[in-house]
Amino acid sequence: LFDFTKMSKNMGKCVMVSIAICLLMVAVKPSFSLAQLRPNGDISKTINLKVVPAQPPYVNVFLDMAPVNCPITPYIENGYTMVPIRALGESLGATIGWDSKNKVVTYSKGEVSLLVTIGTSTINTKDGKILSMPQPACLVNGTTMVPLRLFSEILGYDVAWDDNTRSVYISSPEEPVEIWGFYALGSLNYSSWQDLFGSNYPYTKSPCLAEDMEGIFAGWFFVQEDGTVTAEQNPTGFQKPSGWPSVILEAKRHDVEVYSMYFADHQHSNISAILEEQVLRGKLAKDISIMALEYDGVLIDFEGLGLDPSKADSDMRNFNAFLDELSGLLGDKPMGVAVHPLNSAYKGYDHEYIGQIADFIVLMAYGYEDMSIPTPTAPFDKVDEAVKMEIELVDPQKVILSIPAYGTLYVTAGDRTYLHSRPPAKDGDIKFSDNRVRQMHERGFVPQYLCNYLEWEDLQGRHQAFLEDAVSLKVRLNLTKRYGIKGAAIWRLGYITETVLAPVELVE
C-alpha cells in the first residue's frame, strides 16, 4: 500500500493529465459508447492523478488511465521511448506472434498486420509497404522492445507525455461497451429506480441510464435454508420492491432485458447443504425455472462455495449438477452464473464447465479488501489477474466483468486499523467537519487502485478512503475493451453518480 504522506516528498505536485473521458449516446442499443481517453481535450473538469514518478531512464505507461503490466519496464533510449510490443499490443487487443528462427514479431489486429524484425528500423505491412521506425526493435531478456512511435504514428493511437512523472498515457479507440446493472437492495437514498430511469419512482426522464443498458439483474429472490425461494422480506434484503411490476414494464419500454437473480450464501442459506441433497437440489431448480417464466433470463448468484477447502470438490460437483438440471428445465431461456474469481478464496466453482453450460458468466472481481489493512476493493493487479485467468478457461465473449460502484474507508485509532464502511460512488468525497480535521491530503486518482485515494486525520484518528466516482467507473468500463470480453455489470444501481453519463475531462 502506498503511503502518500511519505510519497509526496518525492512526487512534487500531483499531475493533471490532459485526457478526455466522454460517455456518448449510441444510436443502436445495447451498449455504452465510451469515447477514448483522449489527450488534449477541452477543459471541463480537472482531477488529480497520483502517480509515482519513474526514475530515469524508465517511464510509466498507462492505457486508458489503467496500468499496463510489462515484463520489461519501458525506458527511454536515444530520446525515444521503448515499450514491449507484446504487453502493449495484447492490451490493445492485438495478436502478437513470434518467429524465433527469423527473429520476426507479427502484430495483427483487424485489417492491420505488421512484421517487425529484430535489429531493424523498418516495418513490413501485409500489403507490401515498408514503414520506418526511429529506433530499431531489440530484444531485452527475451522481450521485444519497439519505439512507442509504432503505436502513435504508425497505428494512430493518441499518446500524451507527462514530464513531471515521466509517464506515457495511451488512449485506445472508441468502442461500444455492453452494460448491465444489478437492480437490488435499493433504498430511498440509494434508489435503483432513480439510477436506471433518471427520476424518483414512479417517474422517468430522458436521458437516463436505461436508454443505454443491455439489461438488469433483478436481485429479488433469495434461497432460504430449506431450499425454497422467497421474494418476500428476508434478512438479506434480496426481495421484490413495492411496485416491482413497474420496473419490468418501464424496462421493456426502454428495451432493457430483465433477468431474475437468485441469491444464496452460507450464512443465510447453507447453500452447500442444499446442493448436496439431490431432492432439494432438483426442487430448487424446478422452482427457479417456474419463477423465471415472466423474465427474459436467469442469473444464479450462489456465493461462498468452496471457502472450506475440504468441501471445494463436492461443492463444485453439486453446483455443476444443479446447473445441469436448471439448464434443462429452462430450455431456450438464457442462464447466467455469477462466480467468484479464480484468485479469490472461493474454490467451489468449475469455471470451465460453467463457461460451457451457461450463456454467460458474471465475474465478481471485487471484494479483495482486507478488514484491517487499508486496501481498495478491486485494485488493478487483482482485477487484471482475475480476468486473464478467467478467459484462459472461458470464451471471452461469455465473460461479463462485474465492477463495484462503492469504495472502502478505513480508520486507524491508536494501534487498531479497521474497515469502517464501503461508501457508494454517488456520495462523492467523505463528509467531515473542517474544524475537526488536523491534516488533509489531496484526493487523487491512483491508476494502480483504479479508484481515488483520500486521506485525512481528525480527532477520531487517521482516515484512508479508496473512493469510486464517474471517472473511476469509466476507467473500469474501459477494461472490457482491453480483454475483449462481453461487457460489464455494475454493482449496483443506486450507488452510481449522476455524472457517469456526463463528459468528464482531465486537463493539465
Write out the residue ranges for each language-model feature.
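Primary recognition of N-terminal secretory signal peptides and signal-anchoring hydrophobic helices
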Residues: G12, K29-V177, G181-S187, W193-E211
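Substrate-binding surface in catalytic domains of secreted glycosidases
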Residues: D195, V229-Q239, L307-N435
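Alpha-helical scaffolding within the catalytic cores
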Residues: F197-K205, S242-V247, K283-I288, P341-E352, ...
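Glycan-binding loop/region signatures in secreted carbohydrate-active enzymes
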Residues: A405-N478
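Acidic/aromatic/glycine-rich contiguous surface patches that form carbohydrate-binding/processing clefts
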Residues: R476-E508
